[in-house]
């Protein structure tokens, strides 16, 4: 992808650009183009490292499968993103990059001026955090129901609500999203705390 980006910018804009797929703040702050591999649901949560983005930077969100991420109510840190499927033809990818770069050149607001309290990133409710923590540990619905003193039906209801909120469609996608949340250590801080409390018990 980085080689393709370099070729596109030289051919279309006669520019040499800085590209990063490293999610460290110093790398993000220097990059003209940020390449992110997105798992299902990940587009809806906060990514604090993106707050370091410089003005007019472009994000390429790379995804797999037929389920394209939606542009509705994206978190502010994903401003100026274009979605690219890994199986798309190179010609289409080039066009997307061209139009995305042209569009982000007109941005006038610096990323650090975005107000996080106005952001529409999604989080888990306290009860969903508890259910998600147990699923992340590998507990079955019956076990979760017993531990939380709720019915199995209620456990499945919370699970469906989580999956609906983040537009995910399988247990694998749910586990992958929870893994991303834990790695980011920001979207649901109580998720990590709940896991620590469970380990102490």
Language-model regions: role of each:
Residues 1-111:
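N-terminal regulatory/sensing modules of transcriptional regulators
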Residues 85, 89, 120-124, 136:
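Short, well-structured alpha-helical patches and their helix-loop capping segments
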Residues 106-133:
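Regulatory hinge/linker segments at domain boundaries
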Residues 128-135, 162, 174:
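Short alpha-helical "packing" element that flanks the helix-turn-helix/winged-helix DNA-binding module
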Residues 135-139, 178:
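Short helix-to-turn junction characteristic of helix-turn-helix DNA-binding domains
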Residues 140-173:
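Recognition helix of helix-turn-helix DNA-binding domains
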Residues 163-201:
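Basic, Lys/Arg-enriched C-terminal extension of HTH/homeodomain DNA-binding domains
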